[in-house]
């Protein structure tokens, strides 16, 4: 009986690559579908709330991998209302029951450590001070018309203190029970602001050459690895993305350099990269698969993200383009996404208007599971 079940599982994995098990360092995963880090703005006063335990545990499966929403490493690292942190004892204590709820479902949980840098406003900063950054250049408003405050360029002697904030936050995350941490080096936030030449503009050892611009990122990685161990550390990078008015003139060189730095830590767990922006071909959105050079270079687990659906996810895993695929909006709207992918079942549509609202239920924990939809349909038929 057990052998038959195992054979059936292997057959399913062969037919659906996303459902194949995977060994990620010390961790055994039962499938390749990862919850991407998603800002949800429901951690009041930057303290994780009890409703987050339900939200994350809904999306947890035995042997699945969840990555938390961006979690601030310090008071200066916050840029939006109701974003969680992990720099105070109160925050660490509040995370513990949330992590426990995920672990009870048998899932792994990584905490994404973030500092927004200049993507903030004075009213989100301690004592109304200016946001800190690699630069004093203000973000140019985009289509969202969000206006960020003019930042203050960090002095060279201040940078080690920010590096240490990441180190302490990593230690706090492990104390809260997380299985590991993901360093947020993507999407135009502080680490990205140092790395990309459009936003750096420094003339000290943290600016100018590619090596200098990546120095802050490398120092953060080294500090976090030294604190919690490389086998508990991943990083998210987006060399091609121009979010937050932050872009690089040579993203290929940037991504390649950073991967080489990651490889200096042989046990570093994973590299999570975001695809270039999508193109529209014959009315359909198409992923520009631009991560292959980095995947070939990196020695550890490679996670791809950026608009994937079931078909594309299966393809990139089957082709060896990625080991795991992170899903954001689809996982937000479908708490049982791995099961839906396994069954090729219809998906709930997400409601973008509730992504960043503060309601603890609506648009957060009220998306139906597949069984609930079936029951609803049966009720209608009767």
UniProtKB/Swiss-Prot annotation:
Residues 120-138 have a biased composition (Polar residues). Its cofactor is FMN. Its EC number is 1.3.1.-. The keyword Kinase does not apply. The active site is at 189 (proton donor). The keyword NADP applies. Substrate binds at residues 184-187, 277. CDD domains: OYE_like_FMN (cd02933). It holds the Pfam family Oxidored_FMN. FMN binds at residues 37-39, 70, 112, 236, 307, 328-329. GO terms for molecular function: FMN binding; oxidoreductase activity. InterPro entries: Aldolase_TIM (IPR013785), OxRdtase_FMN_N (IPR001155), Oye-like (IPR045247). Gene3D superfamilies: Aldolase class I. Keywords: Fatty acid biosynthesis, Fatty acid metabolism, Flavoprotein, FMN, Lipid biosynthesis, Lipid metabolism, NADP, Oxidoreductase, Oxylipin biosynthesis. One of its GO terms (biological process) is jasmonic acid biosynthetic process. Residues 120-147 are annotated as: Disordered. PANTHER family: 12-OXOPHYTODIENOATE REDUCTASE 1, NADH OXIDOREDUCTASE-RELATED. Belongs to the NADH:flavin oxidoreductase/NADH oxidase family. Putative oxophytodienoate reductase that may be involved in the biosynthesis or metabolism of oxylipin signaling molecules. This is Putative 12-oxophytodienoate reductase 3. It comes from Oryza sativa subsp. japonica (Rice). The lineage of its organism: Eukaryota, Viridiplantae, Streptophyta, Embryophyta, Tracheophyta.
